[in-house]
């Protein structure tokens, strides 16, 4: 582990979107956290995702269960590792989803409309 990894909370495991989807289907205890801004979810989100924008993340960690595996996802895979590192530092069992919702959609995986987002904007 490099110095930067140590300062940022250590390395976080990363999986692709297909593996994330398999985990969500196989284990109903897995929580997926979407760290995008609400406006970014207008085009849809991963089914069952909990929306906690990265800008609010530190103050909202208590909303997440400490006894369940957590996946983090964002739009393209740049913000979710930051959230994952925060979770790891706080003692959560966390895995980052590479490629974000762009890769999720490209893979043809299910997307759902977020409540309250229809026709926005």
Regions found by a protein language model. Name each.
Residues 34, 77:
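Conserved G/P- and acidic residue-centered "switch" motifs that form tight phosphate/ATP-binding loops
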